[in-house]
From Swiss-Prot:
It comes from Homo sapiens. Residues 1786-1849 form the SAM domain. It holds the Pfam family FERM_f0. Its main location: membrane. The modification Phosphoserine is found at residues 831, 960, 1099, 1709, 1713. This is SH3 and multiple ankyrin repeat domains protein 2. GO terms for biological process: adult behavior; learning; long-term synaptic depression; long-term synaptic potentiation; negative regulation of hippo signaling; positive regulation of cell population proliferation; social behavior; synapse assembly. The keyword Ribonucleoprotein does not apply. One of its GO terms (cellular component) is neuron projection. GO terms for molecular function: ionotropic glutamate receptor binding; SH3 domain binding; synaptic receptor adaptor activity. Residues 1128-1138 have a biased composition (Acidic residues). Signal peptide: none annotated.
Length: 1849
């Protein structure tokens, strides 16, 4: 067929739709047919005809209907069909129903006249010689009557419409006698039914039991090749109807298996498409059907078989010589198709049979890359790990029917040669196989066959003779005979699911099933496939074995007639293939399906590997307890339930010691009803109200709990792994245990092997369709794959690295190499080439919120940065149409796989992706996407995504507090627990794969961003996967606000890695090739999240209760929460995956709707209860977690730390714990600045080094990586500690600022991530000092690395952030790595690596791609002491946004620690709310705080936005974190989220600045383009690190940048206490200098994103603010009064005011409504500002219009919504004129500036061209915006939100 560039898939669909269109007008149909004929037939005909002039045959063709005669030269060796095509091509007039014209040989020499069979060769019809030119007639096929004389009139009477209809009726009812009578009377059966277009024969061929009818018709003159109106022959119809009997009958009657339909496709081709019993396929092949027929898109049969997963058809095709390397029009081989559509079994067969996995499609993508892009990480892993030694080619020769003349093109003897491509053991002498002795051939038969042979000697021997080649005799069939044969695996080819057919010679006359004789083996089965008997079978003859339902069957070989040989219950023999079904066994090795396998299937989100590690009871200490919970009406039970979602009990689930039930507590609110009753995060629910729920789905369990009202009796099992200590170690993730630090997987602290196992398990889980959400990524993958096709770069799998640690760039590269992932040039953030560099901006922000956990944990800060923009983009993508649905991101709410062992589980919701990535399986934000659109994703895809994503996510989550937060409000404790138990995947690769599969969701592996996994629409044509829009699952980050600020941050973080993808998606040319496909996935996820968020925003209950649930809904938070949570259950440290496992299934749905805060989050009052839960969760994160070090850290002090990410208790000696303790000390002693030096060393390493991405991080980051490994744990501990502290602080120090010690990640430039530390007010002062010192030191040296480590730890970098302060304990080293990480741990919430890192990054890490702060930073809050409270505050803040003031009160009231909560918001300051993030302006992403911040906003899910905001805030926070500590600073991201930054991160701006320039260039390219172009609209996109502002962004967003970043008054907490304040001031001044430098740099001014970012970073703390103030007037600071519900925005307030505000800020409620912000900030904050030492702040934030910025915070009710709402972002703090004017007075330029401020500068021109001024804005409707080119939902939402804020203001 002509190959068209159109997607094969589409073409295919088209073709089939055409097939069904029988009613097409005849004329058009004829034309189509003619075209097809010319295309299909002319080619072979012409070619053959001209083969040799000497070998041609001239025939006179008489065309009676046209009254023409032509002499045509034919090739006698071509088929009659070809000759016919030649004739058709010469016609000058068209004939009706031309396909049914045929060459008729008139009667002559005593021969009857007959039509030449179209598939026979012309020379088989000898022409009379000596009579001149032979003559043939070309005429319509009619019955050829034998009678000499015909009564034409009588015949005419017979052929009336009535009679013809009657004839069809008879056929329909199989009235053979009546049919025969009619035919005997002379009826011509070659006619079309006018209604259906069927012919009698085609109708009969589709009927059951129609053998006699078919025979009667044939005898009555029916032509076997007479085509129905749709162009298909009876044979095609029988094949499509899977009618074996009719097919066999037709073949026996002489029909050719190669008849072509109107598209030139054969029946064999159709069988590959329709699937079903492979017997039809076998029959056709046995009858010499030609293989390698291709459609107009170049798809061969094997492509179709792989596309639809018809494994047995595929294997038969391969056995009969199909070309495994055949490429379709896109250059995709069958293996590419498998990779794209996640057809695991088909891929196994191809690889097992010798398929070339190195062949690239026309996008230069290998199957491995396609799989990554499609988010099918398990499959990618399998492809990558397949070795040539695993290849077992067919050693048997195919059997053919001896009755039929062997067509020239069938595979006769040559076939062996054909097969050589898959048979590496083929002998050159293979052709003599035909002469092979029977004895030899017998060797390929099973003993049973041999025994049976005598019974049917002719059949067996006959077929054997033609079927078994000598060389092939060593076939695996020997396995059967000799045991293992050559291929040890062969004996257990578990995957054959089809039914082979007895192809024996007897088949000619007998149906396979009628064939009682010995079964003949065709070929050995592919090992590694698992089959289970689905129906019983009793042996009918010797050699067969009985099967019982449920038997596990090992298939050894495929036999003829649908019989397979295999072993069951110890018996080996034959059985019908239809009796068994394949079950996915993810494990690469062919092992029987084990309980672990099943669990993997069940919990795609969690890596079975991790689960397996604790498979044995010996690993787990099971503690069962029954608790009775009694709650009040207005509150919840205080826990968030997570688990597999299923409408009916999942019977396949086999409880294991590590994962005893499907539902488990993702988080438990400390101090809540559940907590007091002794429930802890990770507890598995065995019974609810005395009903067993071990296998019950999430929704059902939630309903059971609800039905109980206020009374609940739970029987739970606490699984404590003996590995728990290891878990802590894990947290430390000793240097990647079995990996170079490079792998950074060690963060998971799991062995690489176990990680791989997890990957596999995860894949297998994903395969299950239990968890649509989780599988989401899988859904998305197609799209991603398609995108991939378009963007070869998409294949850049760099994101795959999922290591929690951020290894040096070189390490990362090695990881990539290990993974076979193309290493994007710059894994190093500084490297402009880094594919993610461009992405960083958006991604970081997003990462901050959602991917913070995952990203930081799995991705290096740097990587994260790279990813950030794409995340951002994805965030914007979110605005895109429901791509997220297309790409169901991994359920954000995916329950943590029960075994939290692999933190990546949470981190790897991917997907999806992916997931991220067949619908788009790459939706990686499992948490976010799943939550967002759990239902959207197909179960399978979701499951796959889940599986993948979960695994990674868990990994990431473990590292990221966000994951915990994501999980639930209770996530706080859980997060701690989880963090504590966070395990860095030791196998970064596996993690990468997993995470990639949830690419969108995979913050842990930025390189692998699922976002990129957006379906590879480019790669393949899968129409269903056309959604190439990166729908960043980043939306998951939104959920970050849910369960706890932390959670939401985690979500954000998770999303962030994907964010980078979105940019690529947004801009195919983006540097991040992979990003695009992943972007789609991410975008889908993001969008999904946005929707969910919107729903949540719209639902107060969701706001509060669903914050936890929202974690689900918000996807990102959930994963974070979940991962953290699960790890929090110390017992499940390794069971993180388990946690995820169960969590993903239910959580997927639950995450959004199902992730209920049983603790009343859902039950509790929509706003307050939920928020308290959230805050509690944050505060409780540590407490809540059973092993919550938070509580312990609070109580036990530095000694007891909970890993911030995993929520596990940290080993006191672990770097994280050290960091935490150091941080504690630092917080208490403000003199730890010197630590910076050690960090300096690390400085070169990107803070969040994508372990996979960052090769250059090897030096310092290896350490960091290790530390990070522990870091997340450490961080969790810190988090826990902080939560505990926070609890304390909240109680006692409500106003304490969370000093987000964002040590200058910029110092760590490469890390590009700021250390954000939260410190109590008291600690704050000390911490500030320390931080300041540190910041200075770090900024200069590796302090940033230490920060990075924190971030790293957190998500991979967030921990490091904390680490900077942490270094107090370990002055040099700590900061650099452990110390830093430990300190970083302080960041209870993942502090997304802020742009800060970019400041220092300049040198090492050109912030060309100023990455948004690592997700951890972005989304997490550094709340060492108040961390819990602060985190909740964040979440509360988000909620507040959502519910407005009520939420804030909730925050405040929720926890005495709410003060801490406030601090948390202060930390949030770290993650400035989008609106407050001038940086967002600087980089679109900022505005688009989350990947789809805009979308989030657009969904008007402010909470989501908060998440996004968090991420943005994190970025800013990171920036300002170093600059100062705004204890109560509430940072609002451009996305409109306000976060209290208890202690603004010390702004390591200086670093950022230089980096910014570099970054800018890079960013400008990738990020700016992507962000601006694609994500500009969603201002809420997480801002990349300040320094990471992209130049392009700067241009596009410059106004915005100045407004959002530079102009925005810095959000600082004036309440910098003493030394801290001083330190902050110092940092501030440094930052200012840096900023000035940056600003000084052309295009880097306030307008320039980096400039803005710098400012943004600097403004972190009031003092820093003042310092920065001089440097940057563009930063926005806002204080949140504890009492106020909205963060206070400090626009361009005077430094005094700023200071006052800072001071006030401390007190202000975490979130102040924009209005309140304006009021309070202006009045009270003014006084507060005085307290703040940075009067210059206003200068820094010389955004006079900052007050609107307050609104910008979106803190007003609308703005406060959970998701980073665009509304907040929309009023970016800007110095543009529009900020001082009422909207209706805005001019067109004002509108353009305003759009810029929203990071939507890409739409400026359209608005200008359409002369849209302020008076038009309020009236713009959705349709108007679409007409204006604002097609992204997120962008529209951002605009609408911003407008609403403007109008409400």
């Amino acid at each position: 067929m002509p190959r068209s560039p159109t997607s094969s898939e589409d073409e295919m669909a088209q073709s089939f739709s055409d097939y069904s269109v029988g009613s097409e007008s005849d004329s058009s149909k004829e034309e189509t047919i003619y075209d097809t004929i010319r295309a299909t037939a002319e080619k072979p005909g012409g070619a053959r005809t001209e083969e040799s002039q000497g070998n041609t045959l001239v025939i006179r063709v008489v065309i009676h209907d046209l009254q023409q005669t032509k002499c045509i030269r034919f090739n006698p060796d071509a088929t009659v069909w070809v000759a016919k095509q030649r004739i058709l091509c010469t016609l000058t007039q068209s004939l009706k129903d031309v396909l049914n014209y045929g060459l008729f040989q008139p009667a002559s020499n005593g021969r009857d006249g007959k039509f030449l069979d179209e598939e026979r060769l012309l020379r088989e019809y000898p022409q009379p010689v000596g009579e001149g030119v032979p003559s043939l007639e070309f005429r319509y096929k009619k019955r050829v009557y034998k009678q000499a004389s015909l009564d034409e009139k009588q015949l005419a009477k017979l052929h009336t419409k009535t009679n013809l209809k009657k004839c069809m009726d008879h056929i329909q009812h199989r009235l053979v006698e009546k049919i025969t009578k009619m035919l005997d009377r002379g009826l011509d059966p070659n006619f079309h039914d006018p209604e259906t277009g069927e012919t009698p024969l085609t109708l009969a061929a589709q009927l059951d039991d129609s053998v006699e009818v078919i025979k009667a018709l044939k005898n009555g003159g029916a032509h076997l090749d007479f085509r129905a109106k749709d162009g298909m022959t009876a044979l095609h119809k029988a094949a499509r109807a899977r009618n074996q009997v009719a097919l066999k009958t037709l073949l026996e009657l002489g029909a050719s298996p190669d008849y072509k339909d109107s598209y030139g496709l054969t029946p064999l081709y159709h069988t590959a498409i329709v699937g079903g019993d492979p017997y039809c396929c076998e029959l056709l092949l046995h009858e010499h059907a030609t293989v390698c027929c291709k459609d107009e898109n170049g798809w061969h049969e094997i492509h179709q078989a792989c596309r639809y997963g018809h494994v047995q058809h595929l294997e038969h095709l391969l056995f009969y010589g199909a070309d495994m390397s055949a490429q379709n029009a896109s250059g995709n081989t069958a293996l590419h198709i498998c990779a794209l559509y996640n057809q695991d079994s088909c891929a196994r067969v191809l690889l097992f049979r010798g398929g070339n996995k190195e062949l690239k499609n026309y996008n230069s993508q290998t199957p491995f890359q396609v799989a990554i892009i499609a988010g099918n990480f398990e499959l990618a892993e399998y492809i990558k790990n397949h070795k040539e030694t695993d290849i077992v080619p067919f050693r048997e020769a195919p059997a053919y029917s001896n009755r039929r003349r062997r067509p020239p093109n069938t595979l006769a003897a040559p076939r062996v040669l054909l097969r050589s491509n898959s048979d590496n053991n083929l002998n050159a002498s293979a052709p003599d196989w035909a002469v092979c002795s029977t004895a030899t051939s017998h060797r390929s038969l099973s003993p049973q066959l041999l025994q049976q042979m005598p019974s049917k000697p002719e059949g067996a021997a006959k077929t054997i003779g033609s079927y078994v080649p000598g060389p092939r005799s060593r076939s695996p069939s020997l396995n059967r005979l000799g045991g293992a044969g050559e291929d040890g695996k062969r004996p257990q080819p578990l995957w054959h699911v089809g039914s082979p057919f007895a192809l024996g010679a007897n088949k000619d006359s007998l149906s396979a099933f009628e064939y009682p004789g010995p079964k003949r083996k065709l070929y050995s089965a592919v090992p590694g496939r698992l089959f289970v008997a689905v129906k019983p079978y009793q042996p009918q003859v010797d050699g067969e074995i009985p099967l019982h339902r449920g038997d596990r069957v090992k298939v050894l070989s495929i036999g003829e007639g649908g019989f397979w040989e295999g072993s069951a219950r110890g018996h080996i023999g034959w059985f019908p293939a239809e009796c068994v079904e394949e079950v996915q066994c993810k494990p690469r090795d062919s092992q029987a399906e084990t309980r672990a396998d099943r669990s993997k299937k069940l919990f795609r989100h969690y890596t079975v590997g991790s689960y397996d590690s604790f498979d044995t009871s010996s690993d787990c200490i099971i503690e069962e307890k029954t608790v009775v919970l009694q709650k009040k009406d207005n509150e919840g039970f205080g826990f968030v339930l997570r688990g597999a979602k299923a409408d009916t009990p999942i019977e396949e689930f086999t409880p294991t010691p590590a994962f005893p039930a499907l539902q488990y507590l993702e988080s438990v609110d400390e101090g809540g009803v559940a907590w007091q009753a002794g429930l802890r995060t990770g507890d598995f629910l065995i019974e609810v109200n005395n009903e067993n729920v071990v296998k019950v789905g999430h929704r059902q369990v939630v309903n059971m709990i609800r039905q109980g009202g206020n009374h609940l009796v739970l029987k739970v099992v606490t699984v404590t792994r003996n590995l728990d200590p290891d878990d802590t170690a894990r947290k430390k993730a000793p240097p990647p245990p079995k990996r170079a630090p490079t792998t950074a997987l060690t963060l998971r602290s799991k062995s690489m092997t176990s990680e791989l196992e997890e990957l596999v398990d995860k894949a297998s889980v994903r395969k299950k369709k239990d968890k649509p959400e989780e599988i989401v990524p899988a859904s998305k993958p197609s799209r991603a794959a398609e995108n991939m096709a378009v963007e070869p770069r998409v294949a850049t799998i760099k994101q795959r690295p999922s290591s929690r640690c951020f290894p040096a760039g070189s390490d990362m590269n090695s990881v990539y190499e290990r993974q076979g992932i193309a290493v994007m040039t710059p894994t190093v953030p500084g490297s402009p080439k880094a594919p993610f560099l461009g992405i960083p901006r958006g991604t970081m922000r997003r990462q901050k919120s959602i991917d913070s956990r995952i990203f930081l944990s799995g991705i290096t800060e740097e990587e994260r940065q790279f990813l950030a923009p794409p995340m951002l983009k994805f965030t914007r993508s979110l605005s895109m149409p429901d791509t997220s649905e297309d790409i169901p991101p991994p359920p954000q709410s995916v329950p943590p796989s029960p075994p939290p062992p692999s933190p990546t589980t949470y981190n790897c919701p991917k997907s999806p992706t992916p997931r991220v990535y067949g619908t788009i399986k790459p939706a990686f934000n499992q948490n976010s996407a799943a939550k967002v659109s759990p239902a959207t994703r197909s179960d399978t895809v979701a499951t796959m995504m889940r599986e993948k994503g979960m695994y990674f996510r868990r990994e990431l989550d473990r590292y990221s507090l966000d994951s915990e937060d994501l999980y639930s409000r209770n996530a706080g404790p859980q997060a701690n627990f989880r963090n504590k138990r966070g395990q860095m995947p030791e196998n970064p690769y596996s993690e990468v794969g997993k995470i990639a599969s949830k690419a969108v969701y995979v913050p842990a592996k930025p390189a692998r961003r699922k976002g990129m996994l957006v379906k590879q629409s480019n790669v393949e044509d899968s129409p269903e996967k056309t959604c190439s829009i990166p729908i960043p699952t980043i939306i998951v980050k939104e959920p970050s606000t849910s369960s706890s600020g932390k959670s939401s941050q985690g979500s954000s973080m998770e999303i962030d890695p994907q964010a980078p993808e979105p940019p690529s998606q947004l801009r195919p040319d983006e540097s991040l090739t992979v990003s695009s496909p992943f972007a789609a996935a991410i975008a889908g996820a993001v969008r999904d999240r946005e929707k969910r968020l919107e729903a949540r925003r719209n639902s107060p209950a969701f706001l509060s209760t669903d914050l936890g649930d929202e974690d689900v809904g918000l996807g990102p938070p959930a994963p974070r929460t979940r991962p953290s949570m699960f790890p929090e259950e110390g017992d499940f440290a390794d069971e993180d995956s388990a946690e995820q496992l169960s969590s993903p299934m239910p959580s997927a749905t639950p995450r959004e709707p199902e992730n209920h805060f049983v603790g009343g989050a859902e039950a509790s009052a929509p706003g307050e209860a939920g928020r308290p839960l959230n805050s509690t969760s944050k505060a409780q994160g540590p407490e809540s977690s059973p092993a919550v070090p938070s509580a312990s850290s609070g109580t036990a002090g530095p000694g007891n730390y909970v890993h911030p990410l995993t929520g596990r208790l940290l080993d006191p000696s672990s770097p994280l714990a050290l960091a935490l303790s150091a941080r504690d000390r630092a917080m208490k002693e403000s003199q730890q600045g010197p630590k910076g030096e050690a960090p300096k060393a690390d400085l070169n390493k990107p803070l969040y080094i994508d372990t996979k991405m960052r090769p250059s991080l090897d030096a310092g980051f290896p350490t960091v990586t290790r530390q990070n490994t522990r870091g997340p744990l450490r961080r969790q501990e810190t988090e826990n500690k902080y939560e505990t502290d926070l609890g304390r602080d909240r109680k006692g120090d409500d106003k304490k600022n969370m000093l987000i010690d964002i040590m200058d990640t910029s110092q760590q430039k490469s890390a590009g991530l700021l250390m954000v530390h939260t410190v109590d007010a008291t600690k704050l002062d000390n911490a500030l000092q320390e931080e300041d010192e540190k910041a200075e030191v770090e900024m200069k040296p590796d302090s940033s690395p230490s920060e990075v480590p924190e971030g790293v730890s957190e998500t991979e970098g967030a921990l490091q952030i904390s680490a900077a302060p942490e270094p107090t304990t370990v002055p040099g080293r700590t900061i650099v790595a452990v110390g830093s990480m430990e300190e970083a741990v302080i960041l209870p919430f993942r502090i997304p690596p802020p742009p800060l890192a970019s400041v220092d990054l300049d040198e090492d890490f050109i912030f060309t791609e100023p990455l948004p702060p690592p997700l951890e930073f972005a989304n997490s809050f550094d709340i060492p002491d108040d961390r819990a409270a602060s985190v909740p505050a964040l979440s509360d803040l988000v909620k507040q946004k959502k519910s407005d003031t009520p939420q804030s009160p909730s925050l405040n009231s929720s926890q005495p620690t709410n003060s801490a909560d406030s601090k948390k918001p202060a930390s949030l300051s770290n993650c400035l709310p989008a609106s407050f993030l001038p940086p967002p302006e600087s980089f679109d992403a900022v505005a688009d705080s989350g990947i789809e911040e805009v979308d989030s906003r657009s969904s008007s899910d402010h909470h989501l936005e908060t998440t996004s905001t968090i991420s943005t805030v994190s970025s800013i926070s990171t920036l300002s974190s170093e600059g100062g500590e705004n204890v109560d600073t509430c940072t609002v991201y451009a996305d409109g989220q306000a976060f209290m930054v208890d202690k603004p991160p010390v702004p390591p701006k200086p670093k950022m600045k230089p980096i910014i320039h570099k970054s800018n260039a890079l960013y400008q390219d990738a990020l700016v383009e992507e962000d601006v172009d694609s994500f500009v609209i969603p201002p809420p996109a997480p801002p990349p690190p300040p320094g990471s502002a992209q130049p392009g962004m700067a241009k596009v967003l410059q106004p915005r940048t100045s407004k959002l970043w530079g102009d925005v008054t810095e959000i600082k907490s004036p309440i910098l206490s003493g030394p801290k304040a001083n330190v902050i001031s110092e940092l501030n001044s440094i930052l200012q200098q840096m900023n000035r430098e940056k600003l000084a740099k052309p295009g880097e001014g306030l307008d320039s994103p980096m400039g803005a970012k710098s400012a943004s970073l600097a403004p972190r703390s009031p003092e820093i603010m003042s310092t920065i103030s001089g440097t940057r007037s563009t930063t926005v600071t806002f204080t949140v009064r504890p009492g106020t519900s909205q963060p206070i925005t400090l626009q361009s307030r005077p430094p005094d005011y700023e200071s006052r505000t800072s001071g006030t800020r401390r007190a202000p409620s975490p979130v102040v409504s924009p209005t309140e912000m304006n009021k309070e900030t202006l009045p009270a904050p003014l006084s507060a500002a005085t307290a703040s030492p940075s009067p210059a702040l206003s200068d820094v934030f010389s955004l006079p219009s900052q007050p609107p910025s307050g609104d910008l915070f979106g803190l007003n009710p609308a703005g406060r919504s959970r998701s980073p709402s665009p509304s907040i972002l929309q009023q970016p703090i800007s110095n543009k004129p529009f900020t001082t004017k009422p909207v209706h007075l805005w001019t067109k330029p004002d509108v353009a500036d305003w759009l810029e401020s929203l990071n939507l500068g890409e739409h400026k021109e359209a608005f200008m061209d359409n002369e849209i001024d302020g008076s038009h804005l309020p009236n713009l409707q959705k349709e108007d915006l679409i007409d204006l080119g604002v097609t992204r939902v997120g962008h529209r939402m951002n605009i609408e939100r911003a407008l609403k804020q403007l109008l409400d203001r």
